[in-house]
Amino acid sequence: MEWLERLKKSGNGDLEVTYKPFVLEQANFASRHEPGWKIWEDKLFPSRDVPPLLAAQCAANQGEEAFLKYNQLLFRARHQKELDITNQLILLDVAREAGLDLERFSEDIRTRAGVEEVAVRHEEAVAKHGIFGVPTLFFNGGAPVFVKLEEGDWEKSPEADQDLLRELRSVSEKQPFILEIKQPESAKLAERSAKKYKPYME
């Protein structure tokens, strides 16, 4: 998430961010398939999640710094440039921009070298923590907090970044009894999301 990266760069010395993969489509669509269905094993399912998650894990195979750079550029490719990050050519372009070893990256993509790690992390998130969506944040062993953020002018304010971090950390560490907070606008976001995935749910 961009705001976490901004916080790290702004001098939050105690902030360490560890990213772990979670396959949202597995959480959303597993109940519509046969028991034991795993999206990362179903090569015929038109997944929007698996290709970029596997690519990010292939970047991680080249070290943490490579992963962090690739992950940030991948996020920007999707949310700022609105590129199709299921396309292997786009994923390769991002790897090139991140300065990765392209030969190794391409081979890892071809052999799906990161699929086992993605599967293990996803199933661990569900089994241990009941994760259902992304992004979900943990702070110092506190309760998991699922967050939806709207892009806007607030992202230009370092104070807003700090305020958001403080509030989410408080909910995670000190207020685990808060189970859900919603604004009316979130219903519209849910409706748009449902329309996006409707073709896969029929």
Identify the role of each PLM range.
Residues 4-9, 81, 85-202:
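C-terminal cap of thioredoxin/glutaredoxin-like
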Residues 1-90, 167-171, 175, 179-182, ...:
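Structural alpha/beta surface segment adjacent to cysteine/selenocysteine redox centers
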